[in-house]
């Protein structure tokens, strides 16, 4: 089970790119990486590029929800970009597709 997380900081937003699997074993690392992004200047908008995430269980969803709450408490926005069908299905089944802002293409979110 591998998880890769990278961040790119821009003037008004940060893009966090995640690839691999988010589960009980990798969720703590994701939580730490996202916490570091939120501490570093707290951008107005955080975009999480999910296009490389193959699997995400309830532990991973809880990490994403925690991040969403932190961003919203500070007046920011969090967007999930390009989740794969399996992850999108989990978001739909759990009703989280109505909680998160989900965009189909990472490029439309980042403006690139």
Task: Name each model feature, range by range.
Residues 1, 12, 50-54:
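Short acidic/polar alpha-helix capping motifs at helix-coil junctions
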Residues 3-32:
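STAS-typified acidic loop motif
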Residues 20, 84, 106:
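Short, flexible active-site-adjacent loop segments at beta-strand->alpha-helix junctions, enriched
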Residues 24-100:
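Amphipathic alpha-helical interaction surfaces in cytosolic regulatory modules
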Residues 101-105:
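Short acidic-hydrophobic, aromatic-tinged amphipathic segments that line or gate anion-handling sites
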Residues 107-111:
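Short, charged, intrinsically disordered terminal tails
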């Amino acid at each position: 089970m591998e998880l890769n997380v990278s961040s790119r900081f821009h003037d008004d937003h940060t893009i966090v790119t995640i690839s691999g699997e988010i589960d009980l074993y990798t969720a703590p690392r994701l939580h730490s990486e996202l916490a570091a992004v939120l501490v570093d200047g707290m951008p107005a908008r955080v975009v999480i590029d999910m296009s490389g995430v193959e699997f995400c269980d309830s532990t991973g969803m809880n990490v994403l929800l925690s991040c969403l709450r932190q961003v919203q408490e500070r007046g920011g926005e969090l967007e999930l970009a390009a989740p794969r069908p399996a992850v999108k299905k989990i978001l739909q089944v759990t009703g989280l597709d109505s909680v998160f802002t989900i965009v189909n293409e990472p490029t439309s979110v980042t403006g690139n």
